[in-house]
């Protein structure tokens, strides 16, 4: 490719995504991610997202783990919150109806096998209702609050794999559901923020991973699976740092950021991280912080085609972390926000266009009974109700 050309830049992004995912990615989905990505960034910028820019108004780009060049755009270290602020304002300004405190607990199909809506549960009143729809988009996020292998998580309380349960029970296929991303730098001290994300941007601006012997034992911007396994290895082999309460982790040498970038770099580039630690009297400009891997991202999910549609259930679309195949078995930094915007925006457009041609038949929940019959035939018993709308942290039910 012509170095510096638009296609060369996208080709390199494609190769980075494929390599980072151990070439288990679905090529068609990766192509869509990198081809539609620049237009989506421009769309967000036009909507008012306050991306980091230099004095001339050009967007600042940074490296992430496993990337061959700087390409990641950010809004300080709270890009997700800034994008959500902008999109929320857009929803309000356009008077788009939103049903709050209400979760989908079952998809509805018609006799032709098409998705036909969902059963909704009002989590305040306990009342059920039916939403009839010609197209449905599942965008329910991840599963970190399942706490696989007993790990802490950076995820919100609703990250309990609800969308995967809904889709699977209705007949949608799952892809790479065994693959979960452990972010290498989750907070392990203080305990009040156990599992909270220490963003990769901390390492992209200069912080090093250091073991108890003072050794920078690994490149800080390896892919996340490599860095996470490296942290665990150091702790398992006796080179971890003791943490109050009996846990172990490694140091993230944050003072190195200001040595490399100059005084004020931390407050300028990663202000949210600085505030989070200062809330507990820890000045990351002066002392390193202690970290350990945290459950962060669901690499697998529901199977979709290049247009975002389920390949098994007509008129069902999936976007964001609930979809599988885009990131293979390991996601690169920055690609989750890009993914949810590229495929979320696409899903909205495709759903709106498709519903004009859909004719629904009689609605039913036959697939739920069929699924229950399969469980009984297999002798599977469970004491949990799914989807699990909130994690089970109580010792016993009231």
Language model features with spans:
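Single conserved hydrophobic/aromatic residue that forms the stacking wall/gate
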Residues: 1-9
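Alpha-helix capping and helix-loop boundary segments enriched in small/acidic/polar residues
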Residues: 5, 28, 75-78, 124, ...
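Glycine- and aromatic-enriched mobile tails/lids
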Residues: 5, 43, 49-70, 110, ...
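Rossmann-like flavin
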Residues: 20-60
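Conserved redox-cofactor binding core of oxidoreductases
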Residues: 45-127, 132, 139, 147, ...
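A glycine-rich dinucleotide-binding beta-alpha-beta segment and adjacent secondary-structure elements
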Residues: 105-121, 269-323
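Glycine-rich loop(s) and the adjacent beta-strand/alpha-helix scaffold that form part
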Residues: 135-192, 196, 334-350
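An anion/pyrophosphate-binding glycine-rich loop and adjacent beta-alpha core
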Residues: 166, 172-283, 350-357
């Amino acid at each position: 490719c012509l170095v510096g050309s638009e296609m060369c830049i996208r080709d390199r992004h494609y190769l980075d995504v494929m390599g980072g995912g151990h070439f288990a990615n679905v090529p068609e989905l990766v192509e869509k991610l990198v081809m539609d990505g620049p237009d989506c960034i421009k769309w967000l910028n036009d909507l008012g997202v306050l991306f980091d820019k230099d004095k001339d108004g050009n967007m600042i780009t940074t490296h992430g783990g496993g990337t061959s060049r700087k390409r990641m755009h950010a809004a300080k270290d709270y890009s997700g919150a800034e994008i959500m602020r902008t999109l929320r304002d857009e929803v309000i300004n356009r008077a788009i109806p939103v049903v709050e405190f209400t979760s989908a607990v079952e998809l509805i199909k018609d006799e032709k096998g098409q998705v036909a809506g969902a059963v909704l549960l009002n989590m305040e009143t306990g009342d059920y209702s039916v939403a009839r729809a010609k197209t449905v988009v599942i965008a329910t996020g991840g599963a970190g609050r399942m706490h696989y292998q007993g790990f802490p998580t950076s995820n919100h309380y609703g990250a309990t794999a609800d969308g995967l349960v809904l889709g699977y029970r209705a007949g949608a296929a799952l892809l790479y559901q065994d693959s979960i991303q452990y972010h290498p730098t989750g907070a392990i001290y203080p305990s009040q923020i156990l599992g909270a994300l220490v963003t990769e941007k901390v390492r992209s601006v200069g912080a090093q991973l250091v073991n108890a012997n003072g050794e920078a034992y690994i490149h800080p911007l390896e892919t996340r699976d490599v860095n996470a396994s490296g942290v665990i290895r150091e702790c398992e082999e006796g080179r971890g740092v003791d943490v109050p309460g009996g846990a172990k982790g490694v140091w993230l040498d944050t003072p190195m950021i200001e040595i490399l970038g100059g005084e004020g770099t931390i407050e300028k580039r990663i202000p949210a991280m600085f505030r989070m630690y200062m809330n507990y009297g820890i000045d990351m400009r002066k002392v390193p912080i202690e970290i350990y891997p945290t459950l962060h991202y669901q690499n697998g999910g529901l199977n979709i085609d290049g247009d975002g549609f389920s390949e098994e259930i007509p008129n069902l679309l999936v976007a964001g972390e609930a979809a599988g195949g885009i990131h293979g078995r390991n996601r690169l930094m920055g690609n989750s926000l890009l993914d949810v915007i590229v495929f979320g925006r696409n899903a909205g457009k495709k759903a709106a266009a498709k519903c004009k041609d859909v004719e629904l038949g009689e609605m039913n929940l036959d697939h739920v009974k069929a699924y229950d019959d399969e469980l009984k035939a297999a002798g599977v018993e469970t004491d949990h109700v799914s989807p699990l709308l909130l994690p089970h942290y109580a010792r016993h039910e009231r």
